[in-house]
Curated annotation (Swiss-Prot):
Belongs to the NK-2 homeobox family. Keywords: Developmental protein, DNA-binding, Homeobox, Nucleus. It comes from the Eukaryota. Residues 51-66 have a biased composition (Polar residues). Residues 125-184 bind DNA. Transcriptional activator involved in the development of insulin-producting beta cells in the endocrine pancreas. May also be involved in specifying diencephalic neuromeric boundaries, and in controlling the expression of genes that play a role in axonal guidance. Binds to elements within the NEUROD1 promoter. This is Homeobox protein Nkx-2.2a. Residues 1-66, 91-130 are annotated as: Disordered. The lineage of its organism: Eukaryota, Metazoa, Chordata, Craniata, Vertebrata.
Length: 269
């Protein structure tokens, strides 16, 4: 008993100063707690025995202490209740996780019906295609050959003529452009950028009623006012133009009526 009075334990029994019921149990627990206390002094700050183990080692009933008013009586009744209280959350979570799919399984047919109905609606919407009549298709193709891009007023006007909406006309033009582009890509007939139409420069042979003997740079600049670069013509073509100018200047004095013909030709233009 002296050992039990001088011991310093961390169990509920020691904290509440409860007397021992059996000397053997007290001596055994006393020796165990003395050894644990000595080990605790060797390694301070480290608990060798957890409070849960101390609670499990306590006797179930104590004749010297009335614990009917103790709120922890039910908690200290059995070890099974302690383990259940510690692991109750995990068990409940497992039960709820196991039971949670049941309502979803019950509701799954409704959800499947809703999704199937939504899928059928979307499928019906996707399957709807505007069927153009032959007259509408002919008019659309004819207008597409004339003009591949339409403005908003032109689109509305064409839609009113063939009894369609502007959106339908717009979508038809987009699809037709894409179809034509894909057909050209498959055939390898991609249209290259065509050069702008070239204007032919006509040499000035007569100016102000007088024949031009030579073709000067100023005259060439006047003939190229249309924007055609000077490098577009080769030197051979320029020499040919100068030769024609010299030839016309040499032949005009031999025929005095040539000047008169040129003037009348100028008036007839």
């Amino acid at each position: 008993m002296s050992l039990t009075n001088t011991k310093t334990g961390f169990s509920v029994k020691d904290i509440l100063d409860l007397p021992d019921t059996n000397d053997e149990e007290g001596s055994i627990t006393g020796t165990e707690e003395d050894t644990e206390g000595s080990e605790a002094t060797k390694t301070p700050g480290v608990l060798v025995q957890s409070p849960l183990e101390n609670v499990q080692n306590l006797p179930l009933k104590n004749p010297f202490y009335d614990n009917s008013d103790n709120p922890y009586t039910r908690w200290l009744a059995t070890t099974d209740s302690i383990q259940y209280s510690l692991h109750g959350l995990s068990a409940n979570s497992q039960d709820t996780s196991a039971k949670s799919p049941e309502p979803s399984a019950d509701e799954s047919p409704d959800n499947d019906k809703e999704t199937s109905s939504n899928g059928s609606d979307s499928g019906k919407k996707r399957k709807r295609r505007v069927l153009f009549s032959k007259a509408q298709t002919y008019e659309l193709e004819r207008r597409f050959r004339q003009q591949r891009y339409l403005s908003a007023p032109e689109r509305e006007h064409l839609a009113s003529l063939i009894r369609l909406t502007p959106t339908q006309v717009k979508i038809w033009f987009q699809n037709h452009r894409y179809k034509m582009k894909r057909a050209r890509a498959e055939k390898g007939m991609e249209v290259t950028h065509l050069p702008s139409p070239r204007r032919v420069a006509v040499p000035v042979l007569v100016r102000d009623g007088k024949p031009c003997h030579t073709l000067k740079a100023q005259d060439l600049a006047a003939t190229f006012q249309a924007g055609i670069p000077f490098s577009a013509y080769s030197a051979q073509s320029l020499q040919h133009m100068q030769y024609n100018a010299h030839y016309s200047a040499a032949t005009t004095p031999q025929f005095p009526t040539a000047h008169h013909l040129v003037q009348t030709q100028q008036w007839t233009w």
